[in-house]
């Protein structure tokens, strides 16, 4: 029995970046031998075991064969005579198909085992497929795109990009389950440069299949006086990258990605103006979230951002009553933390423009002051002074909030 550390841990060690997780492959063992040594079986489709002390995953060396379309259409073969090279050959990219032996004490020993020249591709900053079996798993398209968001200076090898396009043309991407698509998109959004993920997905044609609403934004012009970058797709990528650079949450980054979907359906005869794009964005966003089964917290923030971002940009011109109505529409009084994320998304929108990434956004501080004033109103005390007439209570609380905001900002109602 020989144990090897494989995949991403070896890649990251060679790149000099922190190793998050280690995957292990066991060559020359049977499931019975593993359990006899205290390993606990957890694999459903193929033998994977948890180490009795570290709880890390150890998989028996295996090969795989495509038997049906989609992510789950594989048949696995594992046996003591499956070699390490055979196991590495089934992996997606050369940079993920390297290994090092693990000593009985758990330390890495010996040289890097690199049958597919992954080290050369690491030095060249290239994503290259291990074999033509790459085409058998459509998730690999999403994984390469996600890796591009993490390793932003890498490029996809021409021959690998050609295979990805073949897979898209063959409909393989259409067979992916929504949960897996969302999982990979979400992970890519949380990387340092999410725009690289979408660039790779566009290059191979996959973005038009999994997120056609986003794909439609490229080539749509905006007013150059507001958007020096002009192209809507370019703008949205700048917004997402700004949100990533600030370390904002997944919900904020998803809202940044989807806030301008309605610009993709603006009638050609009114371009480059986009009057009413906010409401069109909301209508496109709802089925998108349902289709990909987007988590509620991401969906809910994205809907508020899509609907209200234009209003937030204009708050310097608003009176107190308009500000309170904005707070009520966005549920800011009950959900101030979500409103803070709304501000982050809108600030990203304002700064995700060519040459304007350091532009002041005084709207954010104005809204923070106004919301604090509105929330300082004691609705309970007002209700006790009025009695049981709920409509009167509601109107009195509303008026008190307007007055509090007007006083805090020294503006008219």
Curated annotation (Swiss-Prot):
GO process terms (BP): RNA repair; tRNA 3'-terminal CCA addition
Cofactor note: Magnesium is required for nucleotidyltransferase activity.
Required co-factors: Mg(2+); Ni(2+)
Positions with a binding annotation for ATP: 8, 11, 91, 143, 146
Keywords: ATP-binding, Hydrolase, Magnesium, Metal-binding, Multifunctional enzyme, Nickel, Nucleotide-binding, Nucleotidyltransferase, RNA repair, RNA-binding, Transferase, tRNA processing
GO molecular function: ATP binding; CCA tRNA nucleotidyltransferase activity; cyclic-nucleotide phosphodiesterase activity; magnesium ion binding; phosphatase activity; tRNA binding
Source organism, top-level taxon: Bacteria
Catalytic activity: a tRNA precursor + 2 CTP + ATP = a tRNA with a 3' CCA end + 3 diphosphate; a tRNA with a 3' CCA end + 2 CTP + ATP = a tRNA with a 3' CCACCA end + 3 diphosphate
Domain (HD): residue spans on this chain: 232-333
Amino acids binding Mg(2+): 21, 23
Amino acids binding CTP: 8, 11, 91, 143, 146
Its job: Catalyzes the addition and repair of the essential 3'-terminal CCA sequence in tRNAs without using a nucleic acid template. Adds these three nucleotides in the order of C, C, and A to the tRNA nucleotide-73, using CTP and ATP as substrates and producing inorganic pyrophosphate. tRNA 3'-terminal CCA addition is required both for tRNA processing and repair. Also involved in tRNA surveillance by mediating tandem CCA addition to generate a CCACCA at the 3' terminus of unstable tRNAs. While stable tRNAs receive only 3'-terminal CCA, unstable tRNAs are marked with CCACCA and rapidly degraded.
Subunit relationships: Monomer. Can also form homodimers and oligomers.
UniProt protein name: Multifunctional CCA protein
């Amino acid at each position: 029995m020989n144990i090897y550390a494989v995949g991403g841990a070896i890649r990251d060690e060679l790149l000099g970046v922190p190793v998050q997780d280690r995957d292990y492959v066991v060559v020359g063992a049977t499931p019975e031998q593993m359990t006899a040594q205290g390993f606990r079986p957890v694999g459903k489709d193929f033998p994977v075991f948890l180490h009795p002390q570290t709880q890390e995953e150890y998989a028996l060396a295996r090969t795989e064969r495509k038997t049906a379309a989609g992510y789950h259409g594989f048949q696995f073969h594992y046996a003591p005579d499956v070699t390490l090279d055979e196991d590495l050959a089934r992996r997606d990219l050369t940079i993920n198909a390297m290994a090092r032996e693990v000593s009985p004490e758990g330390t890495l020993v010996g040289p890097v085992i690199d049958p597919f020249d992954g080290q050369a591709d690491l030095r060249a900053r290239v994503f290259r497929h291990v074999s033509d079996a790459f085409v058998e798993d459509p998730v690999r398209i999403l994984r390469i795109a996600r890796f591009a968001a993490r390793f932003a200076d890498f490029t996809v090898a021409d021959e690998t990009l050609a295979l990805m396009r073949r897979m898209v043309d063959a409909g393989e991407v259409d067979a992916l389950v929504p949960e897996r698509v969302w999982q990979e998109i979400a992970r890519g959004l949380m990387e340092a440069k999410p725009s690289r993920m979408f660039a790779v997905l566009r290059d191979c044609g996959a973005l038009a299949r999994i997120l056609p609403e986003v794909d439609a934004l490229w080539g749509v012009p905006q007013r150059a006086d507001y958007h020096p970058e002009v192209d809507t797709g370019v703008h949205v990528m700048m917004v997402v990258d700004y949100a990533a650079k600030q370390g904002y949450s997944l919900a904020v980054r998803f809202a940044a990605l989807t806030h301008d979907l309605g610009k993709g359906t603006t009638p050609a005869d009114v371009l480059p103006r986009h009057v009413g794009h906010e409401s069109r964005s909301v209508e496109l966003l709802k089925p998108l979230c349902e289709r990909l089964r987007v988590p509620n917290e991401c969906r809910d923030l994205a809907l508020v951002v899509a609907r209200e971002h234009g209003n937030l940009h204009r708050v310097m011109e608003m009176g107190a009553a308009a500000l309170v109505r904005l707070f009520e529409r966005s549920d800011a009084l009950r959900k101030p933390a979500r409103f803070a994320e709304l501000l982050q998304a809108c600030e990203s929108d304002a700064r995700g423009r060519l040459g304007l990434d350091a532009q002041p956004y005084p709207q954010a501080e104005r809204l923070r002051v106004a919301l604090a004033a509105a929330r300082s109103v004691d609705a309970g005390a007002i209700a006790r002074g009025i009695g049981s007439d709920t409509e009167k209570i509601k109107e009195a609380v509303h008026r008190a909030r307007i007055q509090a905001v007007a006083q805090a900002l020294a503006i008219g109602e």
